[in-house]
């Protein structure tokens, strides 16, 4: 598995005016699997462009201002998922995370997009989110918290 490359991706730590972070529960996982918006970087796309596109695709709005960014952070998939996700081409993701200030209203958020990824969403304190995500991403989220606080 270690010979496989990382998929390049990006993610959004989207904070509202109360300092809470946007999180949503994945639609494709029967377990409570929450996460922040994230996704791949398309060829020729800058990470900052990708994160804005991902917001539109996943939560229906890009009303956000980038106010900070992380270093590149990696996570590995568990062995049993490597062959099931991304057609077995990647061992995990190398991501650039952006701290973003939400500039819209809650009514601007629409997770019922063309290709829905989430079943519900909430504004949460960042430390609570760590316990709600899939276990293999918890160290990544701790790193995000340390870098973007």
Segments the model singles out, each with a brief description of its role:
Residues 139, 143-148:
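C-terminal alpha-helix
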Residues 42-135:
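Unchanged
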Residues 35-36:
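A short gly/proline-enriched turn/hairpin at secondary-structure junctions
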Residues 29-32:
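A conserved beta-turn-beta hairpin within the catalytic core of GNAT-like acetyltransferases
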Residues 1-21, 40-43:
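Conserved N-terminal beta-strand and adjoining loop/helix that marks the start
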Residues 15, 27, 53-57:
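Short alpha-helical scaffold segments that flank and stabilize functional sites
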